[in-house]
UniProtKB/Swiss-Prot annotation:
Reactions catalysed, as given in the entry: a 2'-deoxyadenosine in DNA + S-adenosyl-L-methionine = an N(6)-methyl-2'-deoxyadenosine in DNA + S-adenosyl-L-homocysteine + H(+)
Similarity section: Belongs to the N(4)/N(6)-methyltransferase family.
Any one GO molecular-function label of the UniProt entry: nucleic acid binding
Domain of life assignment: Bacteria
Alphabetized InterPro entries for the sequence: DNA_methylase_N6_adenine_CS, MethylTrfase_TaqI-like_dom, SAM-dependent_MTases_sf
UniProt source species: Mycoplasma pneumoniae (strain ATCC 29342 / M129 / Subtype 1)
Biological process, per Gene Ontology: DNA modification; methylation
The keyword Protein transport is annotated on this UniProt entry: no
Its EC number(s): 2.1.1.72
One Pfam match: Eco57I
Protein name: Uncharacterized adenine-specific methylase MPN_111
Keyword Methyltransferase: yes
Length: 422
């Protein structure tokens, strides 16, 4: 028995308890623990227990005003509602999943757990199954260099996907690095930059509209926030995916895109440019089988021109199978207030049925009412000159009833004001 093992155990236990934050409780640098036999097993159990109790993804809220991390509970609820346990995606080993806007790996961690369960009968060997899921099914584009590291930590337990078991303070990839032969794995570290035209003559980025003089273009800044997924021309995607993933077509696209690019005019987001709609539009253009995203709900009712393309695209193809709308953003992001609420949806290619619309109303974070109905997402109004979304079924019912009354009927039932005059 190692004479230092008991001391190591006590030291590690005290260390984790005193720093129940990020570095020691969830980094999972278990290679630094040299205990053997029963003592090593106890250490492993302690580490796993502490990692679960102090989940890294529950400790970090967000790293900036523009990027809102998805809470673990919200991610789990979104997956459970949009892709129930009996959904085909959990038992199909041939599907390719893409998160084009990964911030911390929460979606793919939860997805990997569900795939591991759903593929048990198809790939009985646990090692082969997990290897297949990690190397052949899940593909991610980090939003920034920092978030790319977080994603690898979450998925591979290591910032370097080919890192083998070591005594260095860098953890280890799943199965000691046997999954990948490169340090990135299936997580791309973003490398695109804002484009201001030939000779940089334009004032704004061609792709996202960022001003040339904004903080995002500062040459001294490590992060450029030129998100790869929306900084590619339409003819560049195939080569980008082939180069980085060896895959050119994705079956399921899922994620929580950055909502805006702040221009510094206000901490509440006033004056900031919304960009989440660009991620949705680009994803639809790739024609996956399924698309699921959680985004601000204001695109449904806002008169801003930047949302017109998204509404027009969705009106045209009618492929949204289900959408969940939350008037209070705190139902999904307890520590954030997002004006206009939040929604998450599942878009299914070539789906032509009605949309299941679930609308949740809350007061002070407590659920008060859920309105659920299957109906057309877009409703024609004003003699079919416009199409709008009624987020509550009763609003649509009231409009339909009023609209069904002809002008003559209105005249016959209308009481003249003059008869009440003296």
């Amino acid at each position: 028995m190692n004479k230092n093992s008991g001391k190591d155990y006590e030291s590690i236990q005290g260390k984790i308890k005193s720093k129940a934050e990020i570095e020691d409780s969830v980094i999972l640098d278990q290679d630094t623990f040299q205990g053997k036999g029963e003592e090593k097993t106890k250490l492993d159990e302690l580490i796993r227990w502490e990692a679960e109790k102090n989940d890294l993804l529950k400790l970090i809220d967000n790293v900036g005003n523009d990027e809102v991390f998805t809470p673990v509970e919200t991610c789990q609820r979104m997956l459970d509602e949009l892709f129930p346990e009996d959904h085909e995606v959990w038992s199909n080993p041939d599907l390719k999943w893409l998160n084009p806007c990964d911030k911390n790996g929460v979606f793919f961690r939860e997805i990997a757990l569900r795939l591991d369960k759903g593929l048990t009968k198809i790939i009985p060997d646990e090692y082969a199954r997990k290897k297949h899921i990690m190397t052949k099914m899940l593909f991610s584009i980090g939003l920034t260099k920092f978030t790319s590291l977080m994603v690898r930590r979450t998925l591979y337990y290591c910032i370097k996907a080919n890192k083998r078991k070591t005594s260095e303070d860098e953890g280890c990839a799943i199965a000691n690095g046997a999954r990948f032969n490169n340090e990135f794995g299936n997580v791309v570290t973003p490398y695109k930059e804002h484009y201001f035209g030939k000779e940089s003559k334009s004032k704004n980025c061609h792709f996202c509209g960022t001003n040339k003089n904004s903080k995002y273009v500062n040459s001294m800044t490590e992060e450029k926030y030129a998100y790869d997924f929306i900084h590619l021309n339409s003819d560049e995607y195939e080569n980008y995916f082939k180069t980085n993933f060896g895959v050119m077509k994705f079956d399921v696209i899922i994620g929580n895109p950055p909502y805006q690019l702040s221009n510094g005019s206000g901490s509440d987001g006033n004056g900031a440019k919304a960009i989440f709609q660009d991620f949705v539009l680009k994803a639809i253009d790739l024609e996956p089988k399924y698309l699921a995203m959680i985004i601000p709900a204001k695109w449904m009712i806002s008169a801003e021109n930047i949302f017109l393309n998204l509404r027009d695209k969705l009106k045209k193809n009618k492929d949204i199978k289900e959408i969940n709308i939350f008037f209070d953003s705190k139902d999904c992001f307890p520590k954030r207030e997002i004006k206009g609420g939040i929604c998450y949806f599942i878009w299914q290619n070539n789906y032509q049925g009605k949309t299941l619309i679930n609308t949740k109303f809350s007061k002070k974070g407590k659920s008060t009412e859920i309105d659920s109905s299957k109906r057309n997402l877009f409703v024609s109004v004003l003699n079919n000159t416009e199409q709008i979304i009624f987020r509550k079924r009763i609003w649509q019912d009231i409009y339909t009833k009023i609209d069904s009354i002809s002008a003559s009927e209105m005249k016959n039932t209308h009481t003249e004001r003059e008869q009440f005059r003296s």
